[in-house]
């Protein structure tokens, strides 16, 4: 099974604008790595595609801010469906295992649209 943590965050500055809070939290270390600036440089150098909505926020502002990071997503376009999911790569990662985990993560999305 794949497990993720859920973390509730409450700002010290209760009156801070929601966009400032999201900006301070993005990208999360779980997505980008840490320290953030060097990690983002590596991602920009290695990844040859636009992440689109993947790893961005989906937020609702209804008297408060409710946001989630889009980890498993799909986007429709005229050319087809793009599925997004990822995993943490470390020095001990086994490439085939990482690939299989990613396939497992998007299997529910594929099933939802009957994609084979």
What spans do the regions from the language model cover?
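Glycine-rich, small/acidic residue-mixed loop/short-helix segments
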Residues: 29-116
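Contiguous alpha-helical scaffold segments within structured protein domains
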Residues: 1-44, 114
């Amino acid at each position: 099974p794949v497990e993720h943590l859920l973390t509730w965050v409450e700002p010290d500055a209760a009156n801070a604008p929601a966009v400032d809070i999201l900006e301070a939290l993005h990208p999360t270390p779980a997505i980008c790595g840490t320290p953030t600036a060097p990690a983002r440089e590596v991602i920009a150098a290695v990844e040859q595609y636009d992440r689109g909505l993947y790893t961005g926020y989906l937020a609702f502002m209804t008297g408060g801010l409710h946001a989630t990071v889009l980890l498993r997503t799909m986007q429709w376009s005229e050319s087809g469906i793009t599925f997004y999911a990822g995993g943490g790569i470390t020095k001990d990662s086994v490439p085939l295992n990482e690939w299989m985990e990613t396939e497992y993560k998007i299997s529910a999305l594929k099933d939802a649209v009957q994609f084979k």
